[in-house]
């Protein structure tokens, strides 16, 4: 909750827990591809990880085989995302 005086912020009271609010309900009426932009908002520091788990689960359940090159690219992107997340805190 933010209290403003014109454009100046007077007080700010953070309320935790609203980042994921309603995400499950939004997912009910969308395909996986339509839902991916919402998934990246779960954790804005690790967007590749949230996208990977969202895409890997249906691929595993349906026994979908992705090309080996795509698998390597995913691993590289996940590692770069992990490194960037660690560097943020230095």
UniProtKB/Swiss-Prot annotation:
Membrane topology (UniProt): Peripheral membrane protein
Keyword Oxidoreductase: no
Gene3D superfamilies xrefs: Cytochrome-c3 Hydrogenase, chain B
Keyword field: Chloroplast, Membrane, NAD, NADP, Plastid, Plastoquinone, Quinone, Thylakoid, Translocase, Transport
Catalytic activity, reaction form: a plastoquinone + NADH + (n+1) H(+)(in) = a plastoquinol + NAD(+) + n H(+)(out); a plastoquinone + NADPH + (n+1) H(+)(in) = a plastoquinol + NADP(+) + n H(+)(out)
Top-rank taxon: Eukaryota
Gene Ontology terms, MF aspect: oxidoreductase activity, acting on NAD(P)H; quinone binding
Cell compartment(s), UniProt: Plastid, Chloroplast thylakoid membrane
Assigned GO CC terms: chloroplast thylakoid membrane
InterPro entries attached to this UniProt entry: NADH_UbQ_OxRdtase_49kDa_CS (IPR014029), NDH1_su_D/H (IPR022885), NiFe-Hase_large (IPR029014)
EC number(s) given by UniProt: 7.1.1.-
Membrane spanning stretches: none
Primary location class: plastid
Enzyme class: translocase
Role noted for this protein: NDH shuttles electrons from NAD(P)H:plastoquinone, via FMN and iron-sulfur (Fe-S) centers, to quinones in the photosynthetic chain and possibly in a chloroplast respiratory chain. The immediate electron acceptor for the enzyme in this species is believed to be plastoquinone. Couples the redox reaction to proton translocation, and thus conserves the redox energy in a proton gradient.
Quaternary state and interactors: NDH is composed of at least 16 different subunits, 5 of which are encoded in the nucleus.
Family per similarity comment: Belongs to the complex I 49 kDa subunit family.
Protein name: NAD(P)H-quinone oxidoreductase subunit H, chloroplastic
Gene transcribed to yield this protein: ndhH
């Amino acid at each position: 909750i933010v209290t403003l005086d014109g454009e100046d912020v007077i007080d700010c009271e953070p309320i935790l827990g609203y980042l994921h609010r309603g995400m499950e309900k939004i997912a009910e009426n969308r395909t996986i591809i339509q839902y991916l932009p919402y998934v990246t908002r779960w954790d804005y520091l690790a967007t590749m990880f949230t996208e990977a788990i969202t895409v890997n689960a249906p691929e595993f359940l349906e026994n979908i085989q992705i090309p080996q090159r795509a698998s390597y690219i995913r691993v590289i992107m996940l590692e770069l995302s992990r490194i960037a997340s660690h560097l943020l805190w230095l």
